[in-house]
């Protein structure tokens, strides 16, 4: 029952984020959805996705608080470097993981600067890692795979239709 509840919570968070892509300002929706996805990641003990949601929430808060473009650029880069270092120290580095961490940085930077090409790269990298993680047995990762596939498609639409 709890497993189903947290899976549904994750999918609901995904819907909140996707709805947020149609709203101005969108960052409140992104944070609300990220909180729900964070709860799902914590329940399933998915370290990568816990870090992803915390890094993205920090980026959205930096935008909301108008901390400045340099902080909005360097905050996700520094946090992703820490995450990469953590995995390196514990000997857990794999190419798909590196791709996922780069995806977090690109997604956060793409959001901060409203750059759809960077956003597309980030969401594609995270989706790729998530499909890989789901295939390797972390089935809740498919929630993030679905979300980031949809975000990549939205970015493609915005690139070619606007």
Stretches with model-predicted labels:
Residues 1-162:
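Alpha-helical membrane-protein topology signature
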